[in-house]
C-alpha cells in the first residue's frame, strides 16, 4: 500500500469519527444513554475483531495495558453518556464541542510529561481553544458568562462528563505515546468499554430499550462507523503521513458539528460556528507550537 493511499484512508477515519456525536445521540434517544452506548460498543468490538484483529495482550507492556484500558474505557463512557444525558439535541452538539478540547490538551500534556519541545504559540493556542468552547456555550450571545452558567446548569452532568473526557483522552494519548511500544490494544479496549457499559446497565436502574427501524439503522451505522474508523486510523498511522492526518484531525470540531446538525436536524447559530472555528484554530496553533523551530 502506498503512503498516499494509507494517508487517505486515515483521513476517512476522521470523517467517520465526525459523525459519532450525531449517531450516538440518535441511538441514545431510543435505547437510553447507557443501553445505547453498550450496544454500539459491543457491535463495534465484534467488528474490530475481524478488521483489526484480537491481539495477544500477554505481549503488551504492563503499564500500557492497565493505564490504556482504564483511560480508554473511562473516556468512551464519558463521551457516550455526556451525549446521551444532554437535555436537547442542540445541547448534545455543544457537549461534543466541549469534548474537542482534547487536541489542545494532548499537546499540552505532551509538553508537560513527554518532553515535547514548544514555543510561545502554545499560550494563544490554548486560550483561543478554551475561548471557542466558552463561545459555543454562550449561545447566541457568544462570550457571555451569565448565559454560559445558565446553559451549563440545565445539564451539569453532561457538560462535566464531556470536560472530564477531554482531559482523560489527552492523558490516554500521552500514555499511549510513551508506553505502547508499537502495540495496538484498540480491539481489547473497545470490548472492555462494552463490558463496563453492560455492567452499568444491569446494575443500575435504566430506561427500557425501545427498538424501532430508525433506531436500529442508527445503531448499526454507529457501530460500523466506529469500528471502521478505528481500523482506518490504524492503517493511516502505520503506513501513511501522520503529519497530514494530525492537521486533518484538528478540523474535526467543525465537521462533527456540521454532520451532527444534519443528522439531528438541529440548526446551529452563527455564534456556534464562530466558537467551533476558534477551537480548530486554537488546536492548530498548539500543533504549530510543537513544529516551529
Swiss-Prot record:
Ranges of the Cytoplasmic topological domain: 1-6, 55-63, 114-119, 169-182, 229-243, 289-293
Family assignment from sequence similarity: Belongs to the drug/metabolite transporter (DMT) superfamily. Aromatic amino acid/paraquat exporter (ArAA/P-E) (TC 2.A.7.17) family.
Periplasmic-facing ranges: 28-33, 85-92, 141-147, 204-207, 265-267
SUPFAM superfamilies, per the entry: Multidrug resistance efflux transporter EmrE
GO biological process: amino acid transport
Keyword Transport included in the entry's annotation: yes
InterPro entries (UniProt xref): Diverse_Substrate_Transporter, EamA_dom
Cellular compartments per GO CC: plasma membrane
Name of this protein: Aromatic amino acid exporter YddG
Disruption phenotype: Mutants show increased sensitivity to methyl viologen.
Main location: membrane
TM ranges: 7-27, 34-54, 64-84, 93-113, 120-140, 148-168, 183-203, 208-228, 244-264, 268-288
Lineage, broadest ranks: Bacteria, Pseudomonadati, Pseudomonadota, Gammaproteobacteria, Enterobacterales
Amino acid at each position: 500500500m502506498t503512503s498516499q493511499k494509507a494517508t487517505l484512508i486515515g483521513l476517512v477515519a476522521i470523517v467517520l469519527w465526525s459523525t459519532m456525536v450525531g449517531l450516538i445521540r440518535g441511538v441514545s434517544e431510543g435505547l437510553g444513554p447507557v443501553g445505547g452506548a453498550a450496544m454500539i460498543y459491543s457491535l463495534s468490538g465484534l467488528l474490530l475483531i475481524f478488521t483489526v484483529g484480537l491481539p495477544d495482550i500477554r505481549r503488551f507492556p504492563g503499564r500500557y495495558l492497565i493505564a490504556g484500558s482504564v483511560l480508554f474505557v473511562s473516556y468512551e463512557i464519558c463521551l457516550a453518556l455526556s451525549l446521551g444525558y444532554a437535555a436537547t439535541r442542540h445541547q448534545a452538539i455543544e457537549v461534543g464541542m466541549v469534548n474537542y478540547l482534547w487536541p489542545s490538551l494532548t499537546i499540552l500534556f505532551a509538553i508537560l510529561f513527554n518532553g515535547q519541545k514548544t514555543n510561545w504559540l502554545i499560550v494563544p493556542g490554548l486560550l483561543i481553544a478554551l475561548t471557542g468552547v466558552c463561545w459555543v456555550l454562550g449561545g447566541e450571545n457568544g462570550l457571555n458568562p451569565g448565559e454560559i452558567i445558565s446553559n451549563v446548569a440545565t445539564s451539569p452532568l453532561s457538560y462535566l462528563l464531556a470536560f472530564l473526557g477531554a482531559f482523560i483522552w489527552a492523558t490516554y494519548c500521552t500514555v499511549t505515546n510513551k508506553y505502547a511500544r508499537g502495540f495496538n490494544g484498540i480491539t481489547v479496549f473497545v470490548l472492555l468499554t462494552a463490558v463496563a457499559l453492560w455492567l452499568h446497565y444491569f446494575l443500575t436502574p435504566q430506561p427500557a430499550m425501545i427498538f424501532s427501524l430508525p433506531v436500529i439503522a442508527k445503531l448499526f451505522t454507529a457501530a460500523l462507523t466506529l469500528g471502521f474508523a478505528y481500523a482506518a486510523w490504524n492503517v493511516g498511522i502505520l503506513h501513511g503521513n501522520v503529519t497530514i492526518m494530525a492537521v486533518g484531525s484538528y478540523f474535526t470540531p467543525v465537521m462533527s458539528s456540521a454532520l451532527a446538525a444534519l443528522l439531528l436536524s438541529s440548526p446551529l447559530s452563527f455564534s456556534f460556528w464562530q466558537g467551533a472555528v476558534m477551537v480548530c484554530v486554537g488546536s492548530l496553533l498548539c500543533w504549530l507550537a510543537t513544529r516551529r523551530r
